[in-house]
From Swiss-Prot:
GO terms for cellular component: DUBm complex; SAGA complex. One of its GO terms (biological process) is chromatin organization. This is SAGA-associated factor 11. A zinc finger (SGF11-type) spans 71-92. One of its GO terms (molecular function) is zinc ion binding. Component of the 1.8 MDa SAGA transcription coactivator-HAT complex. SAGA is built of 5 distinct domains with specialized functions. Within the SAGA complex, SUS1, SGF11, SGF73 and UBP8 form an additional subcomplex of SAGA called the DUB module (deubiquitination module). Interacts directly with SGF73, SUS1 and UBP8. It is found in: Nucleus. Belongs to the SGF11 family. Keywords: Activator, Chromatin regulator, Metal-binding, Nucleus, Transcription, Transcription regulation, Zinc, Zinc-finger. The long N-terminal helix forms part of the 'assembly lobe' of the SAGA deubiquitination module. The C-terminal SGF11-type zinc-finger domain together with the C-terminal catalytic domain of UBP8 forms the 'catalytic lobe' of the SAGA deubiquitination module. Functions as a component of the transcription regulatory histone acetylation (HAT) complex SAGA. At the promoters, SAGA is required for recruitment of the basal transcription machinery. It influences RNA polymerase II transcriptional activity through different activities such as TBP interaction and promoter selectivity, interaction with transcription activators, and chromatin modification through histone acetylation and deubiquitination. SAGA acetylates nucleosomal histone H3 to some extent (to form H3K9ac, H3K14ac, H3K18ac and H3K23ac). It comes from the Eukaryota. Transmembrane segments: none annotated.
Length: 99
């Protein structure tokens, strides 16, 4: 018979592996139960759609570009496209009193 050397590292690795395995099994069991419940309650439920290109929303439809909306900047008084508002505010507010 060979005698195994029990060290703090081996014990801590065993405890960590047991904890991680238990956590993963718990998460998988909960998610599986939740999915089964959703399928039972809503049989026609579609899952969200993922399109890696980024041109479709979560429902699989084309994203609407709201480039026709303009917002009035109270700081500088300009009308700014809604698509560019965040970038404009960053520049506009960082200028501050330099006007």
């Amino acid at each position: 018979m060979t005698e195994e050397t029990i060290t703090i590292d081996s014990i801590s690795n065993g405890i960590l592996n047991n904890l991680l395995t238990t956590l993963i099994q718990d998460i998988v069991a909960r998610e599986t139960t939740q999915q089964q419940l959703l399928k039972t309650r809503y049989p026609d439920l579609r899952s969200y759609y993922f399109y890696p290109n980024g041109s479709l929303d979560i429902n699989g439809l084309q994203k609407q570009q709201e480039s026709s909306q303009y917002i009035h900047c109270e700081n500088c008084g300009r009308d700014v496209s809604a698509n560019r508002l965040a970038a404009h505010l960053q520049r506009c507010l960082s200028r501050g009193a330099r006007r």
